[in-house]
Amino acid sequence: NLYVKEQGQLKPDPLWDDQALFIKSERGLVIILGCAHRGVINTIRHAQKLTGEGAIYAVIGGTHLMAASQQQVDLTLAELLSFDIQRLGACHCTGLPASAMLAQTFGERFYFNNAGSRINL
């Protein structure tokens, strides 16, 4: 529900400026999300396309699942599992219910990312 003002009118924001950082490491691609407004799965696929890297080592940041429906969370979890992500550090706009589901689904590969978190690339 984000909007931009164009020619004096409010229009849905297409979020062209949504940003993420992609790092190619020896362990695979590391994706650092801002808020993933365009979708965490879309961001991962875009990272793979831009870098040519298939293996995903880590996804870190906000997944924008806080206000997502249960169906959307379930679909996102299934897609995330298909990437065989080794480390998933959720925070910010992921929300506690979705974070709990990610923790249950990813087990030891999941952590609550916060200020001061460290990860070896």
What are the functions of these language-model segments?
Residues 116-121:
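A short acidic, often aromatic-flanked loop/helix-cap motif at beta-alpha or helix-coil junctions
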